[in-house]
């Protein structure tokens, strides 16, 4: 299997969806397609979601087809794979980089695509979901949210590459990728039953009005607060801060993992010493909530980031890996 990803053009993406759905009543091998027929919804950032569930930023939200698969499987809040100034081979990601035999571990981090390439994947996914939700009756075409994710420091986020990524996902209509998707839809109207030119023209190009900040383990509290304030006040975005499980403190984390059957997971105290603690986080969150409220935006937290643990049995290459999945759940709640 190749470890190099190649993007799929929008024409190929849509042709695959149409053909697979017509022949097998599935999309990207998702057979239990979710059709929303209820009346219970949840509002966030002025958008009404059909449900608040969806994938976190990860390899499964890195490609357009994976995002489409998440949507047809029922996801309605989709956190896009984190981008930063580094990408591709520069990240130095060893292979394999994910072990999910039981609880999950990884040694990967941000998108392997350059930020502008990642942006194109997210635009294609947005446009595809807008089309298939309407055409196949999967749900309200406005009933889902894309949430972009950036990292890992203020200088990197202000870099023109990442700034362009943010601005273009806030309003994508001027991008070449958006224009290509729109042109394809208008040229293929004969293949649709429930989509017409007026609907295509009405598709909102405001893909992301919210953002999740991911910071490196060990990032100081004042740096985190500065980034969040910048994203709120300068970028005019609703912001989620991804918090680390280390907020709980070493003793609490050790006890929770022990009593829930994960006593074999090993880690040291160093990470707890360099990460912000609860005494730093709570007042910072309260300050940022006030900043957001002052300009009509929302600030919240995402629980939680992955948890750094020791590689002790060759699970993955290297000395440290990041834990997620069911073993992270007791720390999160």
Predicted regions and their residues:
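N-terminal capping/small domains of soluble enzymes
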Residues: 1-234
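Glycine/Thr-rich beta-alpha phosphate-binding loop at enzyme active sites
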Residues: 22-36, 249-333
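Conserved, mostly hydrophobic/aromatic
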Residues: 55, 241, 301
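Active-site-proximal loop/turn and secondary-structure-junction residues that shape catalytic pockets
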Residues: 59-61, 84, 243-249, 305-309
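A structural motif corresponding to the C-terminal end of an alpha-helix
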Residues: 168, 203, 226-237, 280-299
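Extended, H/D-rich, highly charged conserved domains that either
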Residues: 219-236, 240-253, 268-279
């Amino acid at each position: 299997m190749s470890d190099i990803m190649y993007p799929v053009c929008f024409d190929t993406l849509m042709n695959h969806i149409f053909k697979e759905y017509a022949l097998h009543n599935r999309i990207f091998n998702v057979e239990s397609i979710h059709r929303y027929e209820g009346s219970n919804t949840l509002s966030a950032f002025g958008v009404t979601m059909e449900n608040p569930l969806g994938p976190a930023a990860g390899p499964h939200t890195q490609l357009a087809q994976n995002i489409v698969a998440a949507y047809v499987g029922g996801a309605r809040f989709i956190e896009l794979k984190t981008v930063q100034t580094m990408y591709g081979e520069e990240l130095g990601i060893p292979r394999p980089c994910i072990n999910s035999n039981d609880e999950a571990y990884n040694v990967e981090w941000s998108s392997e695509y350059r930020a502008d390439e990642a942006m194109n994947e997210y635009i294609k996914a947005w446009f595809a979901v807008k089309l298939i939700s309407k055409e196949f009756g999967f749900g309200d075409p406005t009933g889902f949210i894309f949430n972009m994710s950036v990292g890992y420091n203020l200088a990197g986020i202000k870099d023109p590459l990442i700034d362009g990524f943010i601005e273009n996902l806030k309003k994508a209509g001027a991008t070449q990728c958006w224009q290509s998707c729109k042109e394809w839809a208008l040229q293929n109207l004969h293949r649709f039953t429930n989509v017409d030119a007026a609907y295509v023209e009405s598709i909102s190009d405001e893909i992301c009005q919210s953002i999740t900040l991911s910071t490196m383990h060990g990032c100081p509290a004042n740096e985190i607060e500065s980034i969040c304030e910048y994203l709120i006040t300068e970028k005019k975005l609703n912001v989620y801060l991804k918090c680390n499980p280390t907020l709980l403190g070493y003793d609490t984390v050790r006890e929770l993992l022990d009593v829930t059957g994960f006593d074999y997971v090993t880690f040291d105290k160093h990470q707890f010493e360099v990460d912000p603690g609860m005494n730093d986080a709570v007042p910072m969150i309260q300050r940022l909530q006030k900043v957001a409220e002052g300009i009509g935006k929302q600030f919240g937290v995402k629980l939680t980031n992955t948890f750094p643990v020791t590689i002790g049995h060759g699970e993955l290459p290297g000395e440290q890996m990041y834990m997620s999945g069911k073993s992270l759940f007791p720390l999160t709640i």
